[in-house]
Amino acid sequence: MTTIAFLGLGNMGAPMSANLVGAGHVVRGFDPAPTAASGAAAHGVAVFRSAPEAVAEADVVITMLPTGEVVRRCYTDVLAAARPATLFIDSSTISVTDAREVHALAESHGMLQLDAPVSGGVKGAAAATLAFMVGGDESTLRRARPVLEPMAGKIIHCGAAGAGQAAKVCNNMVLAVQQIAIAEAFVLAEKLGLSAQSLFDVITGATGNCWAVHTNCPVPGPVPTSPANNDFKPGFSTALMNKDLGLAMDAVAATGATAPLGSHAADIYAKFAADHADLDFSAVIHTLRARADA
């Protein structure tokens, strides 16, 4: 049993912390939003009035926060309250630069630190099937595994500090391109008189198969649990995809890489997010269908 401080108890943090409680760990939580805090408390998290209070008696600190700036402020706020050699795990999605900065900040205070962003969305968090992409020392990851495993379907060591975030932005750029391509295919199928079920059966049994269709199918019917069957209530929102693509484009610019498809996907999602940020990112099919009907 480990005492864990979990900072950020929102859509992802709430089910993740609940799974840690279910695995027998003691979880001390903090979130500035009262509804998030009370929801976590209902699942066995001991909620504190401030982040430093939550961290004070913890062996491990997990952060799941919205931006790199928020993560930096959080670390600055809590590091002095942490016990020596506390393990910090940041599962937020932030830039590689920010990840390396908070890693250095934690190390300067005598702490261990990993960047460990996740893939799998709210469903994966609830089902404890998240993929953790981890950057940091292998020895530190060995210490972290018993804490990550109750939340994980897969844990992948990607390299040194920042490598987890590098893997996350690359993965989500691929995902965005795939989701748009799948949406384009279903819109074209409609125009050709091909049923959605027939196209789904072909793609999932052929070379076009990917998560964007077999799990996140953008049309109602073929996958009953996909957001398309629930008014596109987000498993992974357009706002978050737009944020992640922004991080990817920043990385492309900083490294001098080229990403023509990723750049086009970023442009499509930036425009779609202006009015539909709260929908699942598979709802991008709406804008593609509108273009086809124009």
UniProtKB/Swiss-Prot annotation:
UniProt xrefs under PROSITE patterns: 3_HYDROXYISOBUT_DH
Primary enzyme class: oxidoreductase
Pathway assigned to this chain's UniProt record: Amino-acid degradation; L-valine degradation
UniProt key word Oxidoreductase: yes
Annotated binding of NAD(+), by residue: 3-31, 93, 243
EC number: 1.1.1.31
Active-site residues from the entry: 168
Keyword NAD in record: yes
Catalytic activity: 3-hydroxy-2-methylpropanoate + NAD(+) = 2-methyl-3-oxopropanoate + NADH + H(+)
One BP annotation, GO: valine catabolic process
InterPro entries according to UniProt: 3-OH-isobutyrate_DH-rel_CS (IPR002204), 6-PGluconate_DH-like_C_sf (IPR008927), 6PGD_dom2 (IPR013328), 6PGDH_NADP-bd (IPR006115), HIBADH (IPR011548), HIBADH-like_NADP-bd (IPR029154), HIBADH-related (IPR015815), NAD(P)-bd_dom_sf (IPR036291)
Key words of the record: Branched-chain amino acid catabolism, NAD, Oxidoreductase
GO MF entries: 3-hydroxyisobutyrate dehydrogenase activity; NAD binding; NADP binding; oxidoreductase activity, acting on the CH-OH group of donors, NAD or NADP as acceptor
Similarity annotation: Belongs to the HIBADH-related family.
Record protein name field: Probable 3-hydroxyisobutyrate dehydrogenase
Provenance organism: Mycobacterium tuberculosis (strain ATCC 25618 / H37Rv)
